[in-house]
Amino acid sequence: MPANREGGGSRDACQARRLVHLVPISDRFAPGEPRRIAVLEGSAPRPAPLQVRIGSLGVWTLPAEPAGIRLISIPPVAAEMLWESSPVCTSAQDPIGAPPARSWLLPRSAVKADQEADQLVRLQLQELSRRCGSSVEAAPLLRAFALEHLTTMLPAQLSIRCEPLAPLSFKVP
């Protein structure tokens, strides 16, 4: 299945929010230790809850929040798994739906270039984790992830929310 770290963006109010996985441009990421992933949630007229699906690990529903970054602690990734993030919308709201953000999570990277890209992302996520509960300027963060094209779609400051997945609305896929 192809990956695309950017999802959402349809005209429907629920699906209009842009969702972006903060991963290398290859859409493949080995989280390493500590195991963290991050989703950038764009502006939305009516924010919806966020559904996070990670392969066979499970599906979690996180509460609706305004634009910002969700830094998420995850269970161990023992094999390559598809990670999908999408808003929770009823079919009546949008029968077609916008594509979810999709990325591959890996237990480790095999190629040196991928290892270096993963390390840069881990350093960015580590810096974000130090600022949980505060905010970060959007423009430098977007540059760090080669996402400058989103600058006009986001507020100048993005709140950082840090949350574990394990205790939140776990559902077996």
What spans do the regions from the language model cover?
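Preference for solvent-exposed, low-hydrophobicity sequence contexts
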Residues: 132-173
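Short, compositionally biased P/S/T/A/G/V-rich stretches that sit at domain boundaries
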Residues: 1-32, 114
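Short proline/glycine-enriched turn/loop motifs at strand-loop junctions of beta-rich domains
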Residues: 42-48
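Short, aromatic- and glycine-rich surface loops/edge beta-strands on solvent-exposed regions
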Residues: 50-52, 79-93
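Extended, polar beta-sheet/loop recognition surfaces of beta-rich domains
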Residues: 13, 24, 28, 88-133
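Exposed aromatic-hydrophobic patches
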Residues: 39, 67-76
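Solvent-exposed serine/threonine-rich low-complexity stretches and specific carbohydrate-binding patches
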Residues: 55-68
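Contiguous beta-strand segments within globular domains
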Residues: 28-42
